[in-house]
Amino acid sequence: MADNKTENALSSDATEVRAQKLKLLREQIGDVYPAHFHRTMTNAELGAKYESLEPDVETQDVVTVAGRVYSSRNSGMFMDIHDASGKIQIFSHKDVTGEEARALLPMIDIGDIIGVTGVVRRTKRGELTINAQKIEMLTKSLLPMPEKWHGLSDIELRYRKRHLDIMTNEDSKLRFQQRSKIVSGIRRFMENDGFMEVETPMLQSIYGGATAEPFKTHHNTLKLDMYLRIAPELFLKRTLVSGLTDKVFEINRNFRNEGVSTRHNPEFTMMECYWAYADYEDMMDLVERLFEALALSIHGTTEFDFGDKRLSFKGPFKRVPMPDAVKEATGIDFLTIKTDEEARAAAKAAGFAVEKDWTWGECLAFIFEEKVEATLIQPSHVTHFPKDISPFAKEVPGEPRLVERFETYCNAWELGNAFSELNDPEEQRRRMVEQLEQAHARGEKEKQLDEEFLDAIDQGMPPAGGLGIGVDRLIMLLTNAPSIRDVILFPARRNKAD
C-alpha cells in the first residue's frame, strides 16, 4: 500500500491557489483549455536545427513551441518547458515580451501547459532559448507536480500514478519509449522475414493453448460463458491450416488469472508465430536472429548490462538437452530410468520432494527447475522436454518420452517456448483428451475439448515450427528493468483502499 504521507504531499493548499488562478484566467482570457494550438516544431527539432548556433547569438527566426512548465525562475523571467521530445528555455522580458503575455506570467504554475511564440537565440552560457513574444495558456494544471529531480519515491505510487512517474522520471520515460521501439522492432523483423500478422479472438468460448487459470466472463446476447484467452495458439494453427500464409504471427495480450510477481502480470504481451515446413531448430535460429536485431536497435551492440551482469545476445546461443543439464547438475541420468516409480525414487534419493503420482517427465522437469534454471544466465536453449508436459510437440526420433521442444532462458528467466508442432490428428486428439482428463482430475471442470481445432487438424496441418516469446520479460532485459511492472505502462495492482 502506498505511503499516505507521500500521496498527501501531492495535494496541498497549492491546489486552492491554482483553482483561484483558474477562475481568474477564465474571467480574463476566456478559454483556458483551447481545442487546438499550432506549433511550428518540437523542442527536439528546434535543438537539432540550431545545434550549431554559437553562444550569445540571436537569430531573426520566429518559432512556436508548446510544452509543460517544469521550472520557473525570477518570477517567470526564465522557464523550462518540456514536450515529449525534450526541453527548451523560455525568456520573458519587457524588452521582448508583449504586455498581455507578461500579465499572464504570475498566473503560470509549474505543471501548466503553455504555448510560446518568439525568436530563437543562444545565451552567453550556451543555453538555447526562445525570447517570448507571445505566451498562451493551453492547460491549467490544478495539482502540483512532484519535484522533478526526486520524482515519486514510493514504488506503488509510481505504478498507480504512472503519468506522474513518467512526467518526473527520465529513466521511466526512456524505458517506455524503448518498449515502443522494441515492439515495433519485433513486428518489423517478423514482417521482413516473411511472416503475416493476424488478429485472433481475445474472447473465447473454449480456452486452450496453455495450462493456466483463465478469466471468465459472460456474453449476455449469446447467453454464453466466455474466457479471456490464455494463448492464441489454436487459432493461429487453424490459420496455418487454411493456407492463408505459411508464416503467421500475432503480437497481443494474453490473460492468466494467476499470481503477480516481479516477472508475472495477469495481463501480458506475447509474440506467437507458426512457420510451415520448419521445425524447432529453425525456431532457435529465428530467436537468435530476432534477439540480436533487438539488442542492436536499442544498444547499438549485442552486449548490454542487466543489473550487475553483462549479457550477450550474439548468436549462436548455448543449446543443451534437459536430461543432459539435469545429469550434469545432479548426477541423475533420466535416460537410463525406465519407469515413473524409478524416477520418483531417484529424485527422492537425491533430496527432491516429489509428489507420489508424478510421472517420469514431471520429475525431470521439476529437478530442472530446482537445480538448473538459476544457472542459465547467458542466453541458452534448453531442448528435449518430456512429452508428459508438452502435449503439442513432436516426439524426438528414437526417444518417445522426449519431444522436439525448447525454451530460451536468459538471466535464469524463461523468455521463449517453441515446438516442432504436432500435426498427427489421431495423436493430437489422444494427447488433448489425456490433458483434459488431467485437468478435470485437478478440479478444472470447465475445461473442454476444442473440437473445432481438432476438426481443423483433421483437415491437415503442414509440418511447422511454433514459437511464443514473452515480450514483457524481453523488454525487462533490454531496458534493465528489475520488475515487469516497470515495463507495463499500467500494470495490475490492488485497489487504493486495499
UniProtKB/Swiss-Prot annotation:
Where it sits in the cell: the answer is: Cytoplasm
> Which Gene Ontology terms describe the biological processes this protein takes part in?
lysyl-tRNA aminoacylation
UniProt-recorded Gene Ontology molecular function terms:
ATP binding; lysine-tRNA ligase activity; magnesium ion binding; tRNA binding
Q: In which residues is Mg(2+) 1 bound?
A: 407, 414
Cofactor(s) needed: Mg(2+)
Its predominant location is cytoplasm
- Segments crossing the lipid bilayer: none
Q: Which reaction does it catalyse?
A: tRNA(Lys) + L-lysine + ATP = L-lysyl-tRNA(Lys) + AMP + diphosphate
Subunit details for this protein?
Homodimer.
Give the record's family classification.
Belongs to the class-II aminoacyl-tRNA synthetase family.
Name-wise, this protein is Lysine--tRNA ligase
Name its species: Rhizobium etli (strain CIAT 652)
